[in-house]
């Protein structure tokens, strides 16, 4: 086999993996359907900066980023405000999406990656069960390894045959549909909290935030089913009741996006194929942040590719990427998905109860892109645990739900621990089937 690698899509993890592999002597070409200057949404994004170091990417200029403000969370009744207390050494940085892409692309070019922009990848090119390249329209492009960084609706992952063993569909309640816009500020009202997050906003399966900047209000709306501009406008009108500084004029954004919020793929690899980033569902399930995870995964993938001295790039030789990712991040997010699924079944009154009785505190809402497992969220002393358990026992129905969630989290963790450490086709397929079935049951 050779050392020709195609990266499909300019996802953050794909860009970082391409750069690292090109720097190590591989012939890497990245294909992206958009023009170079059209990448990214017209808004900012946040991520953990240490992920850049993990991926071998230099820090951006200090002029390109600021540090994210702590979020303040409100239950449906807005009766309690819980503000994050993120330690200074764990604060995330905020950058323009376009600047993030420009930084990663410039780095990849310096490392020797070749780019073909405005080239749409439409399907995998197969030789039996092996991915041997991609179709770009009618054009066939061959490679020894294809890295899928095409995102949530990847035309590669969704077209792989069953024999590859890779899930094609995202699954019900596993997509966050997002509307985001920056509205010009109006009036002289200044909110008490700069970054407000409303849970089950309006009593719906909806999260909304209002992040106040000097000249605009950054509004984001998240639902778990598609919605349009008319619905978004109604929600913004509701938000003005508590945040009257949200003006009528959209100065930036006004766009919709889709984000996977679920457990990682059960199979990240197949012969000649590896998925990364949103293509592999690598976001933090509770908040949808995925840039840092994709960057960290890129390093694991690069190390795995380099370790394959024969450049066979089979599912067997790529399996180290899968086990490495699950060890570092995947197991924690698989367990966290159980909590996300349970949150979607919560009633507004139950969320109010958790806030108002002090069962949820500032500790638990201090979730960042560095929150890789539930243990890092639940830093309770035994005394705190007992006190909160007593409060929870006053609501028997909610207590039953919490016990069920705890059982599911334990099962997910145990299931991930059973993932085969060494490639064995039958064992791997059996494990993947059990993993997929476990989460399918939670959707019923």
Locations of the language-model features?
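N-terminal FAD cofactor-binding segment of flavoenzymes
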Residues: 37-74
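Predominantly flavin-linked oxidoreductase catalytic cores and closely associated redox partners
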Residues: 107-245, 281
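Glycine-rich FAD pyrophosphate-binding loop
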Residues: 8-10, 22-41
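Beta1/beta-strand and adjacent pyrophosphate-binding region of the FAD-binding site
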Residues: 1-11
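Short beta-strand to alpha-helix junction loop
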Residues: 86-106, 224-231
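C-terminal helical "tail/cap" subdomain of flavin- and related membrane-associated enzymes
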Residues: 306-444
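N-terminal Rossmann-fold NAD(P) dinucleotide-binding loop
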Residues: 14-15
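FAD/FMN-dependent oxidoreductases across multiple families
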Residues: 121, 227-305, 310-323, 327-328, ...
